[in-house]
Amino acid sequence: IQSMPILERTALQMATGRILDVGAGSGCHALALQEMGKNVCAIDISPLSVEVMKQRGVNDPRLINLFDETFSETFDTILMLMNGSGIIGRLNNMPEFFQRMKRILHPGGCIFMDSSDLRYLFEEEDGSIVIDLAGDYYGEIDFQMQYKDVKGDTFDWLYVDFQTLSLYAVSYTHLTLPTN
């Protein structure tokens, strides 16, 4: 856990109750939570990731999509770390995402999500930022994984800036944001 970034370590320490690790990958966060004595369910859509989690000793790894309606358990903490916002795919999926969170998150529960703001990619030498406001949201990316000659299918991935995420969170939940 000490080799993890401070944001991840803090989220793991703050996670309480029944914890859902979304997009768990190899299970590094789930294993750290288990070592801390916490109850964690780790989900991923990759059969290989779930197999790796099993081999590494994750207690409750599952092959399931967060948006699969048959997955109806509830949790006190939902972790979406390491650019976990990506699974939302597109900005127009935010309402569906927050509706889903309302169904699986216990009242008073927490979602810990991180994302990179890609605005820096559009920064000019003078410090100004040039973004095509008529185009798609600048954090919507078409991803494709490749290893040597093997290419996967393309998929949508969302990097969302803090302000945009906050606006959606307030619009679709009962959250209030602190004022400065």
What positions do the PLM features span?
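Conserved alpha-helix/loop element of class I SAM-dependent methyltransferases that forms part
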Residues: 2-18
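Conserved SAM/SAH-binding beta-strand->alpha-helix loop
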Residues: 46
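A short SAM/SAH-binding and catalytic strip from SAM-dependent methyltransferases
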Residues: 76-94
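Conserved SAM-binding strand-loop segment of SAM-dependent methyltransferases
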Residues: 57-68
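A short acidic, Gly/Pro-enriched loop at the edge of an enzyme's catalytic core
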Residues: 69-77
